[in-house]
Amino acid sequence: MHSKPPWLRAKAPTGEIFNETLNTVKLHGLHTVCEEAACPNIGECWNKRHATVMILGSVCTRACAFCNVATGIPNKLDPHEPENLAKAIKKLNLKYVVITSVDRDDLPDGGASQFIKCIEEIRKITPETTVEILTPDFLNKKGAFEAIAVASPDVYNHNIEMVPRLYARIRPRARYFHSLYLLKMVKQINPKLLTKSGLMVGLGETKEEVLQVMDDLRSAEVDFITIGQYLQPTPKHAKIDRYVTPEEFEHYKYIAYSKGFLVVASSPLTRSSYHAEEDFNRLKACR
C-alpha cells in the first residue's frame, strides 16, 4: 500500500469524552461504522460526541472491494436494537445522529423496517435529536427506500461511492443508475427531505468522470455532496490509484457549488458523516 501523505495523518483517538462514547456504545451493544470501517476521523468525532451507528448487525451480505466491514452470513435482527439505540443517543446527549447499516440482501425488505423503527424510537425518546440516515441501495427490495422516505428522517443519505466505470470491478453487486433512481425518488416522495450522497476519489477515476457524477446527482436533485479520498483498509482491498491533493479537492468543491449543490464537503479526510451536524445547519440555512 502507498505511504500516506502528511495531509492524511489523523490524531490517534484518546480523551475522556472519547472513552465515554466508546463505553456507551459497548454498554448498549451498538455497532458503529467508525470502528467497523476503520474511519480515520474516529478520534475527532467521538470527542465531539458524534458517532455513526450501524444497525442490522455487523456482517454484510456483500463484499465490496473498498469496504472493511465483515462479510458473511448475518445474524437475526435484534428486536431491541431501535430502543437500545435511542437510549444510547439520549445518554450521550446527541443532538445529531447518523444511522447507517450493512447490506442485508437476506431480508425481504433489506432491513428498511428496522430503519423506520429506529427513526420512530428516537423521535419518541429524544425528539430534539436530528436524524440522518445513510442507507444501502435496497436493490430488488420493492417499496423499501420508499417506506423510509415516508418515515421522514431529517436527511436521507445514500452514497453513489464511485464513478460508474469502476462499479464492475469494485462493487459488482451494486448498480449506479439504481442509486441515482433511489435518490431521485426519495425526493419526489418526500420533497421536504434533504438528500445527500458521497463519492470516493483516488480509485482511478478521471476528472471528467467526477464531474459527470456531479451532474447526475444534480439531475436527481441531491442537495449535498461529499467527496473524500479512498483509503485502502488492508492489502486485500482495492488498491489506491493515487492520493488526490488538497488543492484538487478545493477545485472539486468550487465546481460542485457552481453546479448547484447547496452544500459541498470536499477534502482528503471527508467522509459521509464527517462534520454532519455542522453541514446540516449550513444546509438548512441555504434552503
Swiss-Prot record:
Coiled coil: none
Domain (Radical SAM core): residue spans on this chain: 46-262
Family annotation (SUPFAM superfamilies): Radical SAM enzymes
GO cellular component: cytoplasm
Entry-linked PROSITE patterns: RADICAL_SAM (PS51918)
Annotated binding of [4Fe-4S] cluster 1, by residue: C34, C39, C45, S273
Pathway: Protein modification; protein lipoylation via endogenous pathway; protein N(6)-(lipoyl)lysine from octanoyl-[acyl-carrier-protein]: step 2/2
4Fe-4S as UniProt keyword: yes
GO molecular function, one term: metal ion binding
Superkingdom of origin organism: Bacteria
Residue sites binding [4Fe-4S] cluster 2 per the record: C60, C64, C67
Localization per record: Cytoplasm
CC cofactor: [4Fe-4S] cluster
EC number: 2.8.1.8
Broadest EC class assigned to this enzyme: transferase
Cofactor annotation comment: Binds 2 [4Fe-4S] clusters per subunit. One cluster is coordinated with 3 cysteines and an exchangeable S-adenosyl-L-methionine.
Record key words, sorted: 4Fe-4S, Cytoplasm, Iron, Iron-sulfur, Metal-binding, S-adenosyl-L-methionine, Transferase
Predominant location category: cytoplasm
One Pfam assignment: LIAS_N
Reaction(s) catalysed by this chain's protein: [[Fe-S] cluster scaffold protein carrying a second [4Fe-4S](2+) cluster] + N(6)-octanoyl-L-lysyl-[protein] + 2 oxidized [2Fe-2S]-[ferredoxin] + 2 S-adenosyl-L-methionine + 4 H(+) = [[Fe-S] cluster scaffold protein] + N(6)-[(R)-dihydrolipoyl]-L-lysyl-[protein] + 4 Fe(3+) + 2 hydrogen sulfide + 2 5'-deoxyadenosine + 2 L-methionine + 2 reduced [2Fe-2S]-[ferredoxin]
HAMAP family: Lipoyl_synth
Record-stated family: Belongs to the radical SAM superfamily. Lipoyl synthase family.
Protein's UniProt name: Lipoyl synthase
Source lineage: Bacteria, Pseudomonadati, Pseudomonadota, Alphaproteobacteria, Rickettsiales
Gene: lipA
